[in-house]
C-alpha cells in the first residue's frame, strides 16, 4: 500500500493557465478560494433552485429544491471534514499524512464537491434520466450492437448501424451507442464543469465530484474489486481524455476514486434521508405522529439504549414536551436532525480514518455509511420509510410520470435535428438558417449558444477525412441535444413542452 501523503492528492494545478510559483499555505488556499468563487457564481448552481429534489414543480418554498439540498449537504460535508481533521490532529497524524498545511483546501474541496454533487442532474431527477436513456435506447438499440448476424441490428441511425467488414468502426459504433444510452447526472456534472462551462477548476476539486469510475460506454460485468465504485456511469466518451489526464494528475489507478469523494457521498446520504421525510410532512403526505409510527414499525423491537431509542425516540419525546413553544413537527425534525448528525458524522469520520489506506489508494469498494452497523441501519430505515410512504404516494408518482412525458416529448420535438444528414446539419450549423429546413432551423435557434459552441469545437477537432468522422459527428450531435435538455430547469422544461405542443396560448 502506498504511503499516505495528501500533498500528492490535493493538486492545486488547473487544466489551463495553471498558477505558477505557489509555495505557501496561504497561496494554495487562495487557489481553492478561486474555485469556490467560480462554483458559487456559476449559472449551473443557480439553476439548481428550480430543479427537483423529491417533489417536482413545487410552489411551496419550504420544500427543498436541489439547491437547498446541496447547501445542506455542503454543511454536513464540512462537519465530517472538520471531524476527520480534528481526530487526525489528536492522533498527531496531520503532518505524517501531509495535511498539516492543507486543512483549509481539504475542507474547501469537500464543501464545493457537496455543493456541486447534483450539478449535472436533468429536470425531474431520476425520471428525467430514465426518459433520456429510454428515448435513445428505442432508436439506438445498444443491446443489438452485440448481435450476430449484423442484419439483426435494429438501430435506426445509419451511421451507427453495424456493417459487415467494418470491425474497427463497428467497435466504435458499439461504444457510442452504449455511451449515449447511459446518460447519468454524475457523468453530466463532469461534462458540465469541464466541457460546457469551462470552469477550469483545480484537478483536486474536479476529482471530488467523480463519484463513479465506470465509463458510460462500459459493456459487461464490472470487476469485483471495484463493483461499488463502478455502480453507475461516471463520465462519457467525450470526456475520456480529460479523465485520463485527471487520473494522472491525482495519482489515481484505473477505476479508482479520489479520497475526498467518500466524504461528499456520506454527507449526501445523511442529508437527504432526513430531508425527504421532513418535506413529506411539509407536503402533508403524513403527519409527524404517523411518521414516528412508520419509523417505529419499520425498525421493530429495540432496547432502551439502541440507536433508534437515542435518535428517533429521543426526538419524539422531546418534541412532545414542547418546552420551546414551537410546533411539534418543527421540534421533532430539529431534534431528529441533530441526533442523526451527532451519531452519523463521527461514525463516518472514524470509518474514513479506519479505512484510510484503501481510501487514499481510491480502492475502498464501499460507501462510508453502508456496512453492518446500527448507523447504516438507521439510514436504511429512513430510506425504506421514504420509499414505502413518500415516493409511492399517488401525487409524487403522477408528477414523476408527467416529468418523464415532458422530457420524452421534448426529445421527440427536437428529433428532426438528429434526422438531418451530416451534410445538411453541417450546413445548418454554418448558416444557422437553411430555407429548405424551416422546422430544423427554428429548433436549432432555440438551442443554447454554449451548447452549440461545445458541439462546434468538438467537431472541428475531428479529421474530416477519417472514416470515423460521421460516427463522432453524430455522437456530438446527440450530446448537443442531451446537454440542452438536461440543462433545463423543471419549470423551463415544463413550459417549453407546453409551448411547443401548443397546449397553451
Curated annotation (Swiss-Prot):
Family, as annotated: Belongs to the dGTPase family. Type 1 subfamily.
One Pfam family cited in the UniProt record for this chain: HD
Keyword Hydrolase among UniProt keywords: yes
Signal peptide positions on this chain: none
Lineage: Bacteria, Pseudomonadati, Pseudomonadota, Gammaproteobacteria, Enterobacterales
GO molecular function, one term: magnesium ion binding
Keywords: Hydrolase, Magnesium
Example GO biological process: dGTP catabolic process
The protein, known as: Deoxyguanosinetriphosphate triphosphohydrolase
Functional description taken from the UniProt entry: dGTPase preferentially hydrolyzes dGTP over the other canonical NTPs.
Species per Swiss-Prot/TrEMBL record: Escherichia coli O139:H28 (strain E24377A / ETEC)
Enzymatic reactions: dGTP + H2O = 2'-deoxyguanosine + triphosphate + H(+)
Top-level taxon: Bacteria
Domain HD: 66-273
Keyword check for Magnesium: yes
Enzyme Commission identifier(s): 3.1.5.1
InterPro entries: dGTP_triP_hydro_central_sf (IPR023293), dGTPase (IPR006261), dGTPase-like (IPR050135), dNTPase_1 (IPR020779), HD/PDEase_dom (IPR003607), HD_domain (IPR006674)
UniProt subunit comment: Homotetramer.
Cofactor(s) of this protein: Mg(2+)
Amino acid at each position: 500500500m502506498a504511503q499516505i501523503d495528501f500533498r500528492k492528492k490535493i493538486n492545486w494545478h488547473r487544466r489551463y493557465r495553471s498558477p505558477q510559483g505557489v509555495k505557501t499555505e496561504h497561496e494554495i488556499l487562495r487557489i481553492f478560494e478561486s474555485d469556490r468563487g467560480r462554483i458559487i457564481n456559476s449559472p449551473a448552481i443557480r439553476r439548481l433552485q428550480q430543479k427537483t429534489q423529491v417533489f417536482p414543480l413545487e410552489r411551496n418554498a419550504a420544500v427543498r429544491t436541489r439547491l437547498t439540498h446541496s447547501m445542506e449537504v455542503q454543511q454536513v460535508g464540512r462537519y465530517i471534514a472538520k471531524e476527520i481533521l480534528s481526530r487526525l490532529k489528536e492522533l498527531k497524524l496531520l503532518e505524517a499524512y501531509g495535511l498539516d498545511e492543507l486543512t483549509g483546501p481539504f475542507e474547501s474541496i469537500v464543501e464545493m464537491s457537496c455543493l456541486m454533487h447534483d450539478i449535472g442532474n436533468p429536470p425531474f431527477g431520476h425520471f428525467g434520466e430514465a426518459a433520456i436513456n429510454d428515448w435513445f435506447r428505442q432508436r439506438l438499440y445498444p443491446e443489438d450492437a452485440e448481435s450476430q448476424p449484423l442484419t439483426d441490428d435494429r438501430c435506426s441511425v445509419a451511421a451507427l448501424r453495424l456493417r459487415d467488414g467494418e470491425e474497427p468502426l463497428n467497435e466504435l459504433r458499439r461504444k457510442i451507442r452504449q455511451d449515449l444510452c447511459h446518460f447519468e447526472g454524475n457523468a453530466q456534472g463532469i461534462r458540465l464543469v469541464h466541457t460546457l462551462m469551462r470552469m477550469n477548476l483545480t484537478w483536486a476539486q474536479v476529482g471530488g465530484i467523480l463519484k463513479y469510475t465506470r465509463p458510460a460506454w462500459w459493456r459487461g460485468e464490472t470487476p469485483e474489486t471495484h463493483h461499488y465504485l463502478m455502480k453507475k456511469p461516471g463520465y462519457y466518451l467525450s470526456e475520456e481524455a480529460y479523465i485520463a489526464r485527471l487520473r494522472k494528475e491525482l495519482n489515481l489507478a484505473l477505476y479508482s476514486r479520489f479520497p475526498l469523494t467518500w466524504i461528499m457521498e456520506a454527507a449526501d446520504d445523511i442529508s437527504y434521508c432526513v430531508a425527504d421525510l421532513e418535506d413529506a410532512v411539509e407536503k402533508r403526505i403524513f403527519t409527524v405522529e404517523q411518521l414516528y409510527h412508520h419509523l417505529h414499525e419499520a425498525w421493530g423491537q429495540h432496547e432502551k439504549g439502541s440507536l433508534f431509542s437515542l435518535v428517533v425516540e429521543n426526538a419524539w419525546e422531546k418534541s412532545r414536551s414542547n418546552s420551546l413553544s414551537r410546533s411539534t413537527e418543527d421540534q421533532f425534525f430539529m431534534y431528529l436532525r441533530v441526533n442523526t448528525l451527532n451519531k452519523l458524522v463521527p461514525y463516518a469520520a472514524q470509518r474514513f480514518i479506519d479505512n484510510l489506506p484503501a481510501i487514499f489508494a481510491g480502492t475502498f469498494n464501499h460507501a462510508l455509511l453502508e456496512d453492518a452497523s446500527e448507523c447504516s441501519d438507521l439510514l436504511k430505515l429512513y430510506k425504506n420509510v421514504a420509499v414505502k410512504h413518500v415516493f409511492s404516494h399517488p401525487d409524487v408518482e403522477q408528477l414523476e410520470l408527467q416529468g418523464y412525458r415532458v422530457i420524452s416529448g421534448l426529445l421527440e420535438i427536437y428529433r428532426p435535428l438528429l434526422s438531418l444528414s451530416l451534410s445538411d446539419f453541417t450546413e445548418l450549423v454554418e448558416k444557422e438558417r437553411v430555407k429548405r429546413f424551416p422546422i430544423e432551423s427554428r429548433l436549432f435557434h432555440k438551442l443554447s449558444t454554449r451548447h452549440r459552441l461545445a458541439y462546434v469545437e468538438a467537431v472541428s477537432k475531428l479529421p474530416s477525412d477519417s472514416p470515423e468522422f460521421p460516427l463522432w459527428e453524430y455522437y456530438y450531435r446527440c450530446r448537443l441535444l442531451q446537454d440542452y435538455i438536461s440543462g433545463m430547469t423543471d419549470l423551463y422544461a415544463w413550459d417549453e413542452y407546453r409551448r411547443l405542443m401548443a397546449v397553451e396560448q
